[in-house]
Every structure is written in C-alpha cells, then in structure tokens.
Amino acid sequence: MMRTAHKDREPWRDIRRSLLSKWQGVRVCDEPSPWYMSIPTPFSQFHNVLPEEQEEMVFTELKLFLVGNQTENIRIDEYDKHDLPISILANISFDPFIRSELERFHDILVTVATIKICCYAITHDSVTFSSISSAVASTIEKKVNGFITKICTKLSGSTEANQQMNQLLREMHTIHESLNFYNGIVKSIYLDQLIGGQVLSLLDSKRRHVFSGNVVQNLDDVFQAGWKVFARSIGRLVCKFEADHMDYEFVIWSTKQMTDSQCKTLVPSNPSRQIKSSRYVVIESLCPDFFKKYLDILVRCAEFGDSAKSDSSLRRSTSKKINESESVESVMEDVRNVDWSNLDVATTVRMLVQFSRKESACLLREITSATNVDQAIRDIHDLLIKGSCAHDVMLFGLKADILQKPIDEVGNIRMKKLTNDVLGAAAEKHHPFWKYFSFVIDKQNVFEMLGQRTSLGGNADNLRDNVTPMLFECISVKMDCPIEIEPIISMKAVFILTPVFRIWIQLHVASYTIANYRDSIRGQMPSRSLGDIAMKKHLMHALDAEISSIKQKWVGYVDLLINLYYERIQKAASLDEYTECQDILASDVTNMMGISELSQLENIKDILNIIWNYDNADSNLADLIADFEEVQSRARMDVVVA
C-alpha cells in the first residue's frame, strides 16, 4: 500500500517502529484492503433490459457499493498515488438517464470508499498508526456503517419503487456533511501517519470549525473515543508511574526497552521541557495542542514516581516517621479508584491539578523529613550567593600557580585538585553539600553571558574585550545534585546564581591585585616620576575603595534577601512553592546586585578591566584614570536616573 513519507520525519518515528518490531503480536497491515476488491471481468452489455429494471439493478448495486463492494456495473475507475479512489465508473450500457442519475452519487461513493479503505489500513496497522488512531478510525467506521445500514433498512421497506434512487440520494445528502468531515479526518490520519496526541489535535481543530448540531455531536463522540485511550495512559502514569512502553503513542515514553543511543536521539539538545528521570523521555509532538499547557503536570507526575520510590526507601532507613495520612501512598488512593478513561478533558485536568498539589505537598514533607535539606540550601547560598570559598579558591590557585595562567594551560587534573583542596576540604568540615559541586572552566566571558540574559541582551557585544582569558576569569561550578533531593532543589536558581559566584572570584582577585600594585609603589617619592607615583596611588586607592564598596553592598543585599527567603520558605506548602522561593531569591539577588541591568553590569566590568589592564606594557596611566572617571560618572548618572 503506497503512502507518502511523512514530511520532516521526526526521529522518534523510526525509533518507535524499531521498538514495536520487537513485539510479535503487533499488527502490520501487509495485506490489501478487503473493501472494494477489484473485479477482473469487463462490464457486461445489456440487451432488452428496461430502464425500470436497470434502475432497480442500480439501486441494489448502490447499496452493495456503499457497504464496501465493487459491483458488476459500478466500479472504482481510478486511484491516486496513495491507493485512494478518485473516480467511479458505471457500465456504459446503462440507459443515459440512469448514468446521469449515477453521476449525482459520484462524490458520495468516492467519499464512502475512501473512508472505508483508510479506516481499514489505520485499524490494521499498529506500527504505522496507534491505538488512538485505531480507536478514532474504528468509531468513524462504525458511525458510517450505522448511517448506511439505517438508510438501506429504511429504503428496503419503501413502497415507492420508482423513487428509490431519489430517496437514496436524499438520505445520503442528509449525512453528506458528516461524511465529508469523517473523510477529512481519516485521510489526514492515513496520509500524515498521525498517532497519539497528533490525532487528538486534529480532531480538536476540526471541532472548532463545525457548527451543525448533529455533526458536532458525532465529532465529539469520535474525539471521546481517542481521548479515552489518552486519558487511560494518563491514569497509568499517575497511579502506577508507568509511561508508555507498549504502543509508544503517549507523550511520555518509558526507556526500559531503549538503547542508550535511542535515548540520546529522543532527548533534544535544548529541550523546552526536561524530565529529570532517566526512566522517561518526553515526546512533545505527541502531546495534543490543547493539552500542552498541562504537560508540565504530566512531567511532574513522572518525576514524582521516582521521587516517591527513592523517598520510600529513605524513610525506611531513617528513624523519623511520617504520618500515614500524609504519605504519597495515601494520596494516591484518591486517584487509583478513578476510571480515568471515562473522564473528559476538563475533569482530567482538574484531577491532575488536584493530585499534583497533594502529591507535591506530601513529597515536600517526606524529603525534608528524610534529608537535611536546610543544610543543602545553606551550602548553596554560601557557595553561590555569598562567595564563601572565593578567597580560598584564590589562595589555592596562587599556591598552585594556575590562577593567572591562560585556561589552555590548565588541565582537568589541576581543576580536580583545586576542587578537592577547596570544596572537598570544606565538605568534610562545615559545608557537607559542597561535595556535590566541582570546579569547571567556562570559556564564555561572565559579563557577556549576563549581558545576553538581560532584556537588552542584543547589546551584549559591547561587553566583549579582546583579552586572553585567564583561569580566574573562567572558573565556574557544576552541581551534581543527589537524586533524593533533586525535586526540591531549583536548578533554575543554580543556573541564575552561578555567574554571581564567578564575579565574586574576580572581585577577590581584583582586591589581591590592587594590594600587590599598592605594595609595589609604597615608599616611592612622587618627585621621582614627575607625579606619576601620586597618580598611581590615587588610582589604586580609588579602585580599592570601589571594589570594597561593591563587596560591602553585595554582602548587605545578600543578608537581607536570605532573611526574606527564610520567611517565605516557612510558608511553602508544596515542592512548587519551595522551588519558587529559590527562584525568587535568585532573581532578587541578581536584581539588587545590579548584574541584571546592562548599565550597572558594564560599570563592574569596566572597573575590573582597568585593574587587569593596569600592569600591561601598552597601558597609559592617564587613559586608565580617564576611563575610571567615566565609569564613576556613569554610575552617578544611573543613581540620578533611578
């Protein structure tokens, strides 16, 4: 059976076909459709057959054609490249009047034949199509058969033999609108090889363009047939934390039958929705368009499944007990007895939202009871927001003679040693959660990175300088969060705050560099260099005061914001609220520090560049002083404008 290749074929289609091929019981449509089997013999010639007898014959054969058969005198004349009928041919021996009457049935016959052929292919090919596709096609086929059976039964009892064809035509025209909609649906599914949520998206869009009451009801019935299968998969995910591992048509697939390469193929490099568990993968294109705003809830349910299992083992290994009425298991009893397949879209969404809130609250209590989350959060704040290890990083970097080396000269072994010397040692004493962090090299300029994140990110090019990056400019941190508390740690907040840590490193190195410069000119008399020494001392003093002012302001901001954070976190009643508090803190920190605004960010960058360029052979002292005065002028202007 010919069918065009799917446009822009998504990689998940080939993987799905490969996974389904492992199941011997999966139906594959490798036989031609039994509907409208061709008749090899040519048309017979009529001799001495009265027009009334021909009309009776045509009426009978029309009914046979409508139920799926080519006949002696009415046949499909031509197929398109997809093996779908496009024209009907009647016996040329018919009376001209009879042939003209048959022409009035042409579109109806082509439509019915197309529906039957497409429905057979869809319902008998579980590899190309899916359970939802099959349920929709089967429902449409039953409805069309019901329409035709009802009409044929009604006309069989008619006493007006002379008007049978006219009556049949009138009856078929009453359902012609429904037939056209059904034809459009099954042809789209058949030609575009739609499965899962793609079918539901198609049906939902069709419903929005129908205004006839009967057609609306019929399309609603078809939609519910497909939605029932999708809702059943939702129930299995929510109640048993099982993703799709049989039909591979649901929006969340199980990875237990997949190879590593298949999993990597299905996970995009920049996914809009990441799922933390390695047991699942999200196929966003299989989510119905009208349901995508609720996809995050489904993803969370899948993640809750892993969290609930890991937290259950944690509870067994700890002496702390959780009230049984507050456990995830008790909350799940509320949804396990629900027949999800009988819920409509609105009820399903309402159930999901309610369950997600309850489950989130339970997991929050369980995680905080089983692990020392407060300590983990404090350690993250100390490392990223307060820059508590920045001074130690500088000292150990100087000791190892790598701090001011180009990044190309610093390998992974030295970075690992720096991690052990600073973070590893601190983890053994005061900051146990630091053991999940490690130092890495990020070659992107931190100010360029922050400039791209601002609302004026288009001007980020202004932040680039043609300087060779040294290690202290590129040191960053990476967190490998333990799975038992992963749901409660906001990776978004960690992402936002990582540049803050990087700037803390540069501020400490700047203070150290200024101190060295001041030591080098201490004791020298101004008269020896015609005033240059005095200007250098003045510049160093001003730069030192500026860096100290920035650090003091940041410390004050951090203390205030962390106190506000702990006030908010005490009111958090769910995982969402808990992680939202972390996101709010991260946003507030960057806003109050001024690094979320391009003008203030540029001021900090320019001050640091003056310090880094001070000792360059091609630097001019007067130019550096002029640059510094310009920075101060811009800063004062920002204050006035604010």
UniProtKB/Swiss-Prot annotation:
The keyword DNA repair does not apply. Recruited to hemidesomosomes in early embryonic elongation to direct the nucleation and growth of non-centrosomal microtubules. It comes from the Eukaryota. InterPro entries: GCP_N. GO terms for cellular component: adherens junction; hemidesmosome; microtubule. Transmembrane segments: none annotated. Pfam families: GCP_N_terminal. This is Gamma-tubulin interacting protein 2. Keywords: Cell junction, Microtubule. The keyword Transferase does not apply. The gene is gip-2. It is found in: Cell junction, Hemidesmosome; Cell junction, Adherens junction.
